[in-house]
Amino acid sequence: MGSTSGIGLIPNNRTARNLLQLLNHPTIEKRLINKDYEAVGMIPVGTANMVMKTKKISKVAQLRGQRIGVLANNPPQQALVRSVGAQPVYVDLSNAIAQFQQNKIDIMPAPVYGLLPYNLQKDFGPDTQVINFPLAYFGVNIIIKPQAYPANFGRKIRAWFVQNSQLLTNRAIQWENHLPAYYWVDVSFYEKQSYDIMVAKIRNQYVRSGYYDAYFVELMKRLRCIDDPRYFECPMSR
């Protein structure tokens, strides 16, 4: 399940919902269980988008030289930032907002949920904007030690997530819709496609290295293609 947060894998809440609905599929279920741990669900939070304090950036090439917040334990994020000529700066969930407010980073990837307590223009700057292009998906994976619970407990919890997948993802959609429209900035289809290609190249490197689970990456690509057949890795787009 850790691969669900992989760069460029889950582009929206619909794909996250479709993944949740498959948690009790026999082929998938056996991959969620090992001797010591069992993945029983994921709480969707929403897509992580670039938050920046300037309106002068609208193209990938303009990211060169920018300081972008990344998680220290996430090498693919760091590689992606370096690939556009930007500088990765280590942050964590407890200090990312403070680093952004104190101008220690120029760009902060974040889910909208993390921005809702703030007035973006007042707390971050008058030109603050959110790029309407998902870098990754943010969710809270629920992992248990199966030996500490009754038999089939994990399956029952996964069944709950399957049954409530629409409710859970609707909540994430509501959070994203809560952000006023004037903060969102769209990028061109050409820019999105260029960035998708770059993200996929780096992601596939980490699949080959074993950092990402190849099975789940392929599964999520198939789910993405169902939702967006135009995505360049989908058969219909070729």
From Swiss-Prot:
Disulfide bonds: none annotated. Disruption phenotype: Deletion of the gene results in increased susceptibility to different antibiotics, dyes, detergents and disinfectants. It comes from Acinetobacter baumannii. The gene is adeT2. This is Probable solute-binding protein AdeT2. Belongs to the bacterial solute-binding protein 7 family. Mediates antimicrobial resistance via active efflux. Contributes to resistance to antibiotics such as chloramphenicol, erythromycin and novobiocin. May be part of a tripartite ATP-independent periplasmic (TRAP) transport system. Keywords: Antibiotic resistance, Transport. It comes from the Bacteria. Coiled coil: none annotated. GO terms for biological process: response to antibiotic.
